[in-house]
């Protein structure tokens, strides 16, 4: 035991280094009597060896003893106050005893033995010591103060030396009054303020134990019992009575900075989250859920718009509609300072956000213009009422422009008004014609922004504005930005978007404003009538499909699987293949004709599958009517004359004439759903008239107008309970006339009032229209586009819960719906993350001056009396429209106007000083003429020239000499053949001169004498009269053409073609007479030494001939005056 005692003393000395050996027994003796630590525990029915624990358990128990939370259950131990039992203490020297034993796991799970159902408790965060933000720990329960502080009010039973008995009664909650609770709260706040000065716990070293000295004052202040906080904790959660453990008090030590905590944390603020994020201060922080945004800090030139500096200090948020929605507040604030794309589900207030932003830019600017554009006129009209009733923009400053207004009237509106509601087509026309000034526009609001792709008018408007104006804001509104990453990026690029605010129905900040929508998906199978029609049509089309298969133009076998898109792609692929390119014209015409017939009937197959037998029958009748008489092609008549086709028509005709016939199972289910809905709502129970008010409304979406008319026909049988009406677009189609915008607005108003309680709409009713409260949406056919699917479903559930019924056929239509749903959810996640998109923050201007930070001003907007007028703010028509103003060309900033030289484009602008200064030409100095001796070669230089430069190195001495003009006379009469470089004009003149010289014979003197005598006798009379003007023009044209000499051309033809005389003179006649007596040419090189007949003949020099020839040709040319400068001077 001696070794054990020595090791125990060493063990205790590690924690009490400041106590001497003499003072240690006294300190230990005093601590035993006054220590409030828990009593010793020993295991029941066990020996001392059973109570011994392994070192790991000892260290674990020491760690829990500091926090006051034992490790094992209370049922396994009994209180033992025997001071002499030292076997329960484990010495560090006994670690070797368990060295070879396998250590059990230190992780244990507490399982209460007396489990009872506890009610949910909502508590705030308890007082906690500072901890590093990267460490995540569990909750810490604070034990109550010692019971001695409340001895006068809470009696306890003790056994032994003042220790509470196990069956001591617990303190009641009723014993604590409000003063005690207030004192606890005050103490908690005081601990928060002193949090910076408290030392953080160390994770590497054991705590240093020091003597604890308590003063009565401290004990009285901390004597508040907080056991009521542990009322709902199970009784066996602790091993011993919790009232026996004293509270752990931290010692006051100098504060040290650890874990990289921020030094500028304000006092009195508690840490509520990780990484130094503190709670909000109510005095300077916005309400919970709202954010504070400021204009971005950018270095940009001042805007050209005139700003109202008094209004820039605040931005107004209207509270006319009641409660402020956090998401609308945050989105509107961000849309004021960034080019923003807002993606909100339908019915969540995109119009309110747009009206708020329009109001603030209307306040901030003095004369700038604000434009709201929407695809259709009904969408434009419904936005006007929102701006009048919510934002309070004066009606006198607002106008609605469409293409129906005259250009002169629109020009006046652009000059006088500031807020415009219009379609994008009208806007781009006014911008291009110069009626609208692009530099005055400060805000462009785009509704249904998912259309801003490709060459749509939205994209064209933004590009046009960007050319002339760099200081305007863009706000884009939509419910679904796109179905693919590429389409969303196209919208961002087309509108220069810098930020995206997207919300889904699962977003936390809009969940309380989204009403529940019960979606019911109903699938159907083909009816017996549909199967019969499919079989007969398959037999009709099978021969045509087989012909395409034999030509490898189409691979499908089942005619019922034909689609217009598939046939079009197959035709393109076959035409691009080798078989299609190499096929003869007849085969190509045959394949194209078969594809055209099958594509027309593929649409009929879709109508039969998904819409009903009646639309299918109407399409077949139209197909059959195209073959009457001589109309239609070979294969179209082959289909109509087929026996199966005739049998099909005979079956369909009596079915469609029956008014009670319903040609599709979806239509039968639709009728029952609509009837049940109105009967549950009590519609038409008292025989109401058709113009009475309706409490509930239904909207049915279809894909084709034929389907809409068929659904309306079936539902009209049950009037006045069901009062349906068709709602289609403006364009007219075969067998169906379109609806004008005025008619569309009238139907929407009647639907809101209850005149019609059911609308059967095509895609025109999907986008944007505020058609009132709809309680039931029926999608008669599925759309593979997630945009259209979401637009349809967004018509209901705006102000109360709504229902959606999807009618789908098994197979392709059901798969399309699942694909659209998955695609929508995936795209919403991608857009919200923003990691796969490129935003244009660099071209999103600040517009506001630097240093301006508008503060939110929530207030009620006073609506002007003029806004109460219900009519649209369209310009009034006049008897005589004003004259259209002349087109105005708006120039971008820093553009150079006027004309400029092409040479100055690359050199850049020159200053006037450079133009005025001309470089002075220096006077040339006379060159001194060298002496003759310095120019002439010396004898040595002459020899070097002869040997090195004129000797060609042959056996006999040969020297290079100048070309001889009399050598090779026969070859010099014609142009020698060339390969790359052709003969020049000088060469051709030289050849002509030599040819003329060759014509001179020895008897030329006698011949010319005879000619002169004959000419003097006739005195120059002409044999042939003057030529006609036509001949003269031909001769002049021939003279302008270049003359070419060829080997096959005779010398006489060359002579005749080069004559300059205009009349046929006797010389021509004589030359033609003596033509047969032509002699061989004579050359001087052929003369013999004995021939002295022409010794006196001296031929002219070659330079003289060339010079005179050039002077004669130049005499006929007209000189031109060339202007060296094209300037205005």
From Swiss-Prot:
Disulfide bonds: none annotated. Residues 674-843 form the Helicase C-terminal domain. CDD domains: DEXDc_FANCM, FANCM_ID, SF2_C_FANCM_Hef. Residues 331-499 form the Helicase ATP-binding domain. GO terms for molecular function: 3'-5' DNA helicase activity; ATP binding; ATP hydrolysis activity; DNA/RNA helicase activity; flap-structured DNA binding; four-way junction DNA binding; four-way junction helicase activity. The keyword Amino-acid biosynthesis does not apply. InterPro entries: FANCM/Mph1-like_ID, FANCM_DEXDc, Helicase/UvrB_N, Helicase_ATP-bd, Helicase_C-like, P-loop_NTPase. Residues 45-63, 297-306 have a biased composition (Basic and acidic residues). It catalyses: ATP + H2O = ADP + phosphate + H(+). Residues 877-889, 1028-1044 have a biased composition (Basic residues). ATP binds at residues 344-351. Residues 1-101, 124-222, 236-306, 863-930, 1018-1060, 1072-1129 are annotated as: Disordered. It is an enzyme of class 3 (hydrolase). A motif (DEAH box) lies at residues 447-450. Belongs to the DEAD box helicase family. DEAH subfamily. FANCM sub-subfamily. ATP-dependent DNA helicase involved in DNA damage repair by homologous recombination and in genome maintenance. Capable of unwinding D-loops. Plays a role in limiting crossover recombinants during mitotic DNA double-strand break (DSB) repair. Component of a FANCM-MHF complex which promotes gene conversion at blocked replication forks, probably by reversal of the stalled fork. This is ATP-dependent DNA helicase mph1. The gene is mph1.
């Amino acid at each position: 035991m001696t070794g054990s005692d020595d090791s125990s003393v060493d063990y205790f000395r590690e924690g009490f280094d400041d106590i001497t050996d003499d003072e240690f027994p006294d300190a230990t003796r005093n601590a035993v009597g006054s220590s409030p630590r828990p009593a010793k525990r020993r295991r029941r029915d066990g020996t001392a060896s059973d109570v011994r624990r392994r070192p790991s358990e000892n260290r674990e128990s020491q760690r829990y003893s500091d926090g006051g939370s034992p490790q094992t259950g209370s049922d396994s131990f009994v209180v033992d106050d025997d001071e002499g039992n030292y076997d329960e203490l484990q010495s560090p020297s006994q670690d070797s005893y368990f060295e070879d034993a396998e250590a059990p796991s230190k992780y244990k799970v507490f399982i209460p033995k007396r489990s009872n159902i506890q009610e949910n408790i909502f508590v705030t965060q308890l007082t906690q010591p500072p901890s590093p933000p990267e460490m995540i720990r569990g909750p810490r329960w604070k034990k109550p103060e010692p019971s001695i502080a409340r001895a006068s009010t809470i009696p306890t039973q003790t056994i032994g030396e003042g220790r509470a008995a196990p069956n001591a009664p617990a303190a009641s909650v009723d014993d604590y009054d409000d003063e005690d609770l207030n004192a606890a709260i005050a103490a908690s706040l005081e601990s928060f303020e002193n949090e910076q000065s408290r030392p953080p716990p160390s994770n590497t070293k054991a705590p240093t134990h020091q003597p604890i000295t308590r003063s009565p004052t401290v004990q009285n202040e901390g004597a508040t019992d907080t056991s009521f906080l542990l009322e709902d904790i199970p009784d066996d959660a602790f091993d011993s009575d919790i009232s026996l453990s004293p509270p752990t008090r931290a010692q006051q030590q100098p504060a040290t900075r650890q874990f990289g905590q921020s030094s500028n944390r304000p006092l009195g603020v508690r840490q509520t989250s990780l990484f130094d994020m503190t709670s909000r201060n109510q005095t300077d922080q916005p309400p919970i859920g709202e954010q504070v945004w400021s204009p971005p800090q950018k270095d940009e030139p001042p805007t050209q718009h005139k700003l109202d500096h008094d209004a820039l200090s605040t931005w107004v948020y209207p509270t006319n509609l009641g409660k402020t929605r956090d998401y609308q507040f945050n989105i509107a604030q961000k849309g004021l300072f960034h080019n923003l794309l807002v993606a909100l589900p339908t019915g969540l207030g995109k119009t309110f956000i747009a009206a708020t932003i329009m109001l603030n830019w209307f306040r901030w600017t003095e004369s700038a213009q604000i434009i709201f554009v929407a695809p259709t006129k009904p969408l434009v009209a419904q936005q006007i009422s929102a701006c009048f009733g919510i934002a309070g923009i004066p009606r006198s400053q607002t106008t609605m422009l469409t293409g129906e207004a005259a250009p002169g009237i629109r020009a006046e509106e652009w000059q006088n008004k500031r807020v415009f509601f219009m379609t994008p087509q009208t806007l781009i026309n006014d911008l291009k014609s110069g009626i609208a000034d692009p530099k005055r526009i400060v805000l462009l609001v785009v509704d249904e922004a998912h259309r801003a792709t490709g060459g749509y008018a939205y994209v064209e408007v933004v590009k046009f504005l960007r050319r002339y104006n760099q200081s305007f804001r863009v706000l884009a509104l939509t419910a679904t930005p796109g179905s693919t990453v590429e389409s969303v990026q196209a919208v961002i690029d087309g509108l220069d978007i810098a930020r995206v605010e997207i919300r889904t129905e699962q977003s936390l900040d809009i969940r309380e404003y989204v009403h529940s929508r019960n979606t019911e998906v109903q699938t159907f199978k083909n009816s017996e009538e549909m199967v019969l029609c499919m079989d007969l049509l398959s037999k009709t089309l099978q021969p045509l499909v087989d012909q395409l298969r034999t030509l490898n133009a189409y691979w499908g076998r089942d005619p019922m699987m034909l689609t217009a898109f598939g046939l079009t792609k197959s035709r393109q692929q076959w035409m691009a293949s080798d078989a299609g390119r190499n096929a003869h014209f007849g085969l190509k015409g045959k394949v194209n004709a078969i594809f055209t017939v099958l594509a027309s009937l593929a649409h009929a197959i879709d109508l039969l599958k998904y819409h009903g037998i009646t639309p299918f029958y109407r399409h077949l009748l139209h197909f059959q009517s195209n073959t009457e008489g001589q109309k239609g092609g070979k294969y179209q008549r082959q289909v109509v004359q087929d026996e199966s086709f005739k049998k099909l028509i005979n079956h369909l005709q009596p079915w469609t004439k029956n008014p009670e016939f319903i040609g599709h199972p979806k239509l039968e289910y639709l009728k029952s759903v609509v009837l049940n809905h109105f009967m549950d709502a009590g519609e038409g129970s008292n025989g109401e008239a058709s113009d009475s008010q309706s409490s509930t409304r239904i909207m049915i979406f279809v894909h084709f107008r034929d389907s809409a008319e068929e659904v309306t026909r079936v539902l009209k049988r049950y009037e006045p309970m069901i009062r349906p009406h068709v709602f289609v677009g403006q364009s007219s189609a075969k067998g169906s006339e379109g609806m004008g915008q005025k008619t569309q607005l009238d139907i929407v108003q009647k639907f809101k009032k209850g005149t019609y309680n059911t609308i059967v709409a095509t895609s025109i009713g999907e986008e944007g229209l505020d058609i009132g409260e709809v309680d039931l949406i029926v999608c008669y056919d599925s759309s593979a586009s997630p945009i259209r699917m979401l637009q349809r479903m967004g018509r209901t559930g705006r102000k109360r819960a709504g229902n959606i019924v999807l009618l789908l056929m098994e197979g392709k239509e059901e798969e399309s719906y699942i694909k659209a749903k998955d695609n929508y959810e995936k795209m919403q996640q991608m857009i919200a993350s923003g990691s796969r998109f490129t935003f244009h923050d660099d071209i999103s201007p600040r517009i506001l001056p630097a240093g301006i930070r508008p503060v939110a001003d929530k207030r009620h907007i006073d609506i002007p009396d003029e806004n109460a007028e219900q009519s649209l703010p369209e310009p009034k028509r006049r008897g005589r429209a004003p004259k259209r103003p002349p087109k105005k060309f708006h120039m971008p900033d820093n553009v150079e106007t006027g004309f400029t030289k092409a040479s100055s484009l690359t050199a850049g602008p020159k200053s006037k000083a450079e133009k005025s200064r001309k470089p002075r030409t220096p006077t040339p100095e006379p060159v001194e003429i060298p002496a003759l001796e310095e120019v002439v070669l010396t004898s040595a230089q002459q020899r070097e020239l002869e040997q090195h430069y004129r000797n060609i190195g042959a056996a006999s001495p040969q020297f290079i000499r100048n070309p001889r003009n009399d050598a090779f006379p026969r070859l010099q009469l014609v142009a020698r053949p060339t390969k790359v470089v052709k003969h020049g004009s000088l060469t051709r003149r030289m050849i002509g001169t030599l040819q003329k010289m060759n014509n001179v014979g020895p008897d030329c003197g006698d011949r010319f004498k005879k000619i002169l005598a004959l000419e003097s006798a006739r005195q120059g009379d002409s044999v042939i009269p003057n030529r006609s003007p036509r001949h003269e023009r031909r001769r002049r044209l021939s003279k302008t053409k270049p003359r070419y000499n060829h080997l096959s051309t005779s010398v006489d033809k060359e002579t005749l073609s080069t004559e300059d005389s205009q009349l046929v003179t006797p010389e021509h006649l004589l030359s033609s007479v003596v033509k047969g007596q032509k002699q061989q040419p004579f050359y001087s090189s052929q003369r013999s030494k004995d021939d002295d007949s022409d010794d006196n003949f001296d031929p002219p020099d070659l330079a003289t001939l060339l010079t005179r020839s050039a002077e004669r040709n130049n005499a006929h040319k007209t000189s031109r005056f060339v202007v060296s400068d094209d300037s205005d001077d």
